[in-house]
Regions:
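Beta-rich strand-turn-strand
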Residues: 97-98
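Active-site-proximal, substrate-binding regions of enzyme catalytic domains
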Residues: 51-77
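Acidic, PIN/NYN-like endoribonuclease modules and their adjacent C-terminal/linker elements
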Residues: 1-2, 107-140
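Short, well-structured N-terminal submotif of metal-dependent ribonuclease cores
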Residues: 1-42, 57-67, 140
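Acidic catalytic patch
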Residues: 21, 41-48, 70-94
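Conserved glycosyltransferase catalytic-site signature
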Residues: 11, 83, 102-103
Length: 140
């Protein structure tokens, strides 16, 4: 990995980093976000999932949601899901055992040329297309 490497974060990593639901995972996720900084990539799907879950679980006010969205777009690269990503996600579902939503995340990470996808939901250590390694940052 180089200083120019990019990393994809799934919504579960953000949810731990932004909530106090699990102190150990929150610490791990927060450290990961801090360490990776502006090299972080994620999709509008992740923004949506994070916002809806924080709104539901943490009762965030709409003003706080707007500030969070602004922060995401200001500090990180938020990737739009395009037709090519949807097609790639379909192919991933056909050839691997990805769920619909996980296939979109994986296809988006591949499209953004990320080297690592951090997610709690997918198979830790799996390398996709010899390009993208999936890592569960909470696995000990």
């Amino acid at each position: 990995m180089t200083d120019e490497s990019s990393f994809f974060l799934d919504s579960n990593v953000w949810l731990y980093a932004l909530s106090n639901e699990d102190a150990e995972k929150a610490e791990t996720a927060s450290a990961l976000v801090k360490d990776l900084g502006e090299r972080i990539r994620f999709t509008t799907q992740v923004v949506n999932e994070v916002c809806v879950n924080l709104k539901r679980k943490s009762s965030l006010e709409e003003g706080e949601i707007r500030r969070l969205i602004d922060s995401f777009y200001l500090n990180y690269t938020v990737v739009e899901i395009k037709e090519s990503v949807l097609i790639s996600a379909s192919e991933l579902r056909e050839h691997h055992s990805f769920s619909f939503w996980d296939s979109l995340i994986a296809a988006s990470a591949l499209s953004a040329n990320a080297e690592i996808l951090y997610s709690e939901d997918m198979q830790d250590g799996f390398v996709l297309d010899n390009k993208l390694k999936i890592i569960n940052p909470f696995k000990i």
